[in-house]
């Protein structure tokens, strides 16, 4: 009888221990769940990588000018920097062809002018250039309109081709149009003059536009040597 009571007490004790363990495990699970609920949630949305468009490099012009004459126009510009540049002349208004002309020049464009230099009622476009370096030698790039149809290149003779003109010539030219004539001026250097200081005065050349065998050309018409001031 005593053994039966002892067995009953053992069973009751085991049941009590099992209940406590279940309660402890349940509390532990509840605590863990509550801890997870209290953790800060990552609300940051995943961002897709953005692709930036590469910057488009704008065309840069070292010279740009538009000239107009009685319904015909010329867009003149140079691209690039440094001594070698690309000269572009884009005509507009001709009936047959308005194809652009591209030329490589040594130096820079100082100015561009339009005028009727042969009194035919149609324009000539003249681009004045200056070479790089201490001499700054000048040149004229010119085109003459063939009526309303198109335009053709005009020949401009270098000073070195004319014995009288080249005496004392060391560059530093300037160009202009006066009374429908092309004018070129440059300082005259005497023997021994440094490039930075001429003492021989100024030579002024007036050109006229004439018809040549293959194309129109400029011819020196008047030459005047002006004394130093």
For each predicted feature, which ranges?
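C-terminal motif of bacterial Sec signal peptides marking the signal peptidase cleavage site
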Residues: 16-19
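Beta-propeller blade repeat segments, especially FG-GAP/WD-type strand-to-loop junctions
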Residues: 86-96, 137-157, 209-211
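Mid-length scaffold segments of soluble, non-membrane domains
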Residues: 114-151
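Bacterial N-terminal signal peptides that target proteins for export
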Residues: 1-8
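Terminal domain-start segments
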Residues: 21-110, 218-229
